[in-house]
Design a protein with these regions (language model features):
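Catalytic-domain carbohydrate-binding cleft regions of carbohydrate-active enzymes
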Residues: 1-167
Length: 167
């Protein structure tokens, strides 16, 4: 069944980037933008990031109920805050997210870094197929060994500070 989790736009479905047919489907989605003359792309949040899942949100909201009407001292505040923060990128959520790779069911937490790699791969292979005579610019936030074949590596949310240039 599809894996549903929330990110920037709210609830979203995640393409199975380890599945060849899904990668081809995803890569073909670039056609519309290429037809508009777009020649540069930036894959973001493709770790993939998860803000929350419905199951985890339900559990956390139930736990937060016990704080209602309380005067939160520092310890209780940090406990409350920790519960809320536990929603985002919770490792338990990655354990219930599965991929289909060559007919084999694989748990996401075991191949986490391959998601971003294969997302960029899907785009790179699509660009070669859709625009074989053009070199399309592609940056990806998430990467893995060999990803440079398909796009450049973006180092994340850096600032224009000298100390960040050293990263």
């Amino acid at each position: 069944s599809p894996f549903v989790a929330a990110v920037w736009p709210g609830k979203a479905l995640f393409p199975d980037m380890l599945n060849k047919e899904a990668r081809e489907w995803f890569g073909n989605k670039y056609q519309f933008l290429l037809d508009q003359g777009v020649e540069g792309f930036w894959n973001d949040m493709n770790e993939p990031a998860i803000f929350y899942t419905e199951d985890r949100l339900k559990d956390v909201l139930e736990e937060l109920d016990r704080f209602k009407g309380q005067n939160l001292d520092m310890d209780k505040y940090y406990e409350f805050n920790g519960l809320v923060r536990s929603l985002s990128n919770n490792t338990e959520d990655y354990k219930v997210f599965y991929h289909n790779m060559n007919g084999e069911k694989i748990r996401h937490d075991r191949v986490h870094n391959l998601f971003g790699y294969n997302m960029t791969r899907a785009a790179g292979e699509a660009f070669e197929r859709l625009e074989p005579d053009k070199r399309i610019l592609m940056f990806s936030r998430s990467s893995y060994i060999g990803m440079h074949r398909y796009g450049g590596i973006w180092q994340g949310d850096n600032k224009s500070w000298w100390s960040h240039i050293l990263l």
